[in-house]
Design a protein with these regions (language model features):
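Structural signature of tandem-repeat unit edges
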Residues: 12-40, 50-64, 73-87, 94-115, ...
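Short, flexible, glycine/charge-rich loop motifs used to bind or transfer phosphoryl groups or to couple energy/partner
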Residues: 7, 46, 69, 89-90, ...
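Extended Gly/Ser/Thr-rich low-complexity repeat segments
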Residues: 2, 135-136, 147
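Conserved mid-sequence domains
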Residues: 68, 214, 238-242
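Short acidic, glycine/serine/threonine-rich loops at helix termini
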Residues: 70, 91, 171, 193, ...
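Short, aromatic/basic amphipathic alpha-helical patches
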Residues: 2-8, 32-34, 45-46, 236-243, ...
Length: 267
């Protein structure tokens, strides 16, 4: 176990768990000081801090995997999602996770190259933190879920031309170095690249209209390219704690002949 019933740390030794033939049922004592189990639910922080856990196969009748069910399971390499699961919220701190696989009989979710997608393969929902290198999103993807790439180690992404939506904090605290977003994206939501401490270069498309609060908070940008003919609306905290010298250290690149419109815009 990772934690005792009072929430205190335990020096657990579990490395491989196969409970595919078991059931999770309601009742019994508390775990993590104040939580109780529910029928067929992998509850909030149920396996939290199981530092030696490497692989897990869940019960075949699980219907829901809640937020941070595997919080800080730093050795976890793979998770197998059963056919019955219809709701999943990602877990933080799974720094070694390389593969999320899904039963072929599951109609709510699928996986591609170990990445969790919606059943129709149009949305990326959970990207394993243990993956390295660059990553090209599947051509079918039109949306990226909130926190989907949080804390990931990918340095460069290739986005599909049909991408139309990115969720809040989707790339929060990731290692991304450069970003080129397609023109199909009209707005960037709150905190989408917040605390991306390696992000230097960003390219935004022709139709971008809104940069919400904290989009580039904590990002040491050196070059920001915007091809939209008119400047997008920015929140009062779009760049937040990026620093007082941001306007001196980051070069803004705009379309030829449009500089006066960007200079005249106060928002």
């Amino acid at each position: 176990a990772g934690r005792g019933i009072d929430g205190s740390a335990r020096n657990g030794r579990l490395a491989d768990i196969d409970i595919s033939g078991a059931r999770i049922v309601a009742g019994g004592g508390v775990y993590d000081a104040a939580r109780y189990s529910e029928d067929n639910v992998v509850g909030v922080e149920l396996f939290a801090a199981c530092n030696n856990l490497k692989n897990i196969k869940l019960p075949m009748d699980v219907v829901r995997i809640e937020k941070d069910a595997f919080l800080n399971c730093s050795s976890l390499r793979s998770i197998v999602i059963p056919a019955t699961v219809s709701s999943i919220v990602p877990s933080a701190g799974c720094t070694s996770l390389e593969e999320i696989s899904v039963s072929g009989a599951n109609t709510s979710y699928t996986s591609s190259d170990g990445v969790l997608l919606s059943g129709d393969a149009k949305s990326i929902l959970w990207f394993p933190m243990g993956k390295r290198g660059d990553y090209a999103l599947p051509a079918t993807v039109t949306a990226v879920g909130s926190y989907a790439f949080r804390d990931c180690s990918i340095g460069k992404f290739v986005f599909p031309a049909g991408l139309t939506k990115i969720g809040e904090c989707a790339f929060y605290n990731s290692k991304v170095r450069e970003v080129a977003l397609p023109s199909t994206l009209k707005m960037l939501p709150t905190g989408v690249f917040q605390k991306c401490a390696d992000l230097k270069t960003v390219r935004l498309g022709n139709d971008v209209e809104l940069l919400s609060d904290y989009v580039f908070d904590g990002c040491p940008l050196t070059d920001l390219y915007i091809t939209a003919p008119l400047p997008p609306v920015c929140g009062s905290n779009t760049f937040a704690t990026t620093g007082a010298d941001f306007v001196k250290t980051c070069r803004l690149h705009v379309p030829k002949g449009r500089k006066k419109y960007y200079r005249a815009n106060a928002k």
